[in-house]
Amino acid sequence: MFFFSQPELNAIYLSLKVATIAILFALPVAIFIAWILSRKQFWGKQLLNGIVHLPLVLPPVVIGYLLLIVMAKRGAIGQYLWEWFGFSFSFSWRGAVLSSAVMAFPLMVRSIKQAFDAIDPKLEQAARTLGASPLKVFFTLNLPLSFSGVIAGAVLGFARSLGEFGATITFVSNIPNQTQTIPAALFTFIETPDGELAAARLCAIAIVISLIALSASEWLAERQKRYAK
């Protein structure tokens, strides 16, 4: 397609596939955790908040290593997934999805939590006074009012997933057509003789996609602020 080589197209396609699936699976969990952190008071809340945000402060290689010892074929959990279901994250695009979801998760939670925090608790109290159940309040009040924040979190997570490298290459290596996303392919081309042009093209694609995602996220965040007022 145009001036992209097949390996470049494969990396772009795999990156979009991995990022999309990662966000689809991580978003419901991020919404739930963000709601808990925003609306509930319980012992261990700060601990949960710290665990959620660990991927923001730990080196990605450390996250990749933790995934390796927990979710690989011989990992603490991964071995049972393999023995019972024949399912493995090791050396496959599924592992890239998992590592991308983990790295994007705290950004999604932060954005969605801010949206929940902006909702006036008095609205929820009024809804409960009128007989609405907590579940109905969540789906008819909390979620619609925080929708822009949820989408902004998803967009930020998508951008972070596209840029994920350290955790992915540590967990599932750098295998063409399997785990070689844009950052991994860029790394490979940089180390390959005469790979400068391919690296530059992938770099340009990554910048364009990231700018679009960040612009969309900022626009949605501003919209959420105006709507909250």
Where are these regions (language model features)?
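Membrane-interfacial helix termini and adjacent extracytoplasmic/periplasmic loops
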Residues: 3, 64-101, 171-175
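Transmembrane alpha-helices
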Residues: 24, 109-112, 116, 120, ...
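C-terminal transmembrane helix and the adjacent membrane-cytosol boundary/short C-terminal tail
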Residues: 44, 113-124, 128-129, 199-229
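Transmembrane-helix boundary motif in ABC transporter permease subunits
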Residues: 21-52, 65-67, 115-117, 122, ...
